[in-house]
Amino acid sequence: MKRTLFFATFFIVFAFIGCGKTPPSGLPPLVSCKVKVHDNGRPLPKIGVAFQRTEGHAGWSLNGLTGTDGIAVARTIAGSFDAPGLPTGSYRVTLNERIELPPEFNNDDDPTMAEKRQKYLAEHRTLPEILCDPARTPLELTVTGSAAELDIDVSRFK
């Protein structure tokens, strides 16, 4: 009985450890990267952070999402592979926020609805537009061989 229990436990542990997603070919080592997003010290939760390589195309999704503390851990995603960290290199950084529209904005029969939606979004946006635009963002991050951190105070861009 003990032998069976040992082998069953060994098999379960091996299955969990040995079944990790393998990195895609050509993926360089990943470096730990954290981004803190706040508005004059007040953490901003649920802010998406995206990283665009300044040279070439990564071929992978590079992003993160802030928690209640305003901190996002950068992740590299390629197919079913998903791991914390970014490959070394230089990146432009953009932010995005999800704003829930109330049900009354779901009336597509109203010809003025698109304009009303845009007005609502503009009134409820907390991020400066420049930080959301990949072509205009002033936010940059260089990831070297050691852990990288970026502190973004959005109040500086309002």
Q: Which sequence ranges carry the predicted segments?
A:
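Beta-strand-dominated extracellular/periplasmic modules and repeats
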Residues: 20-141, 148-158
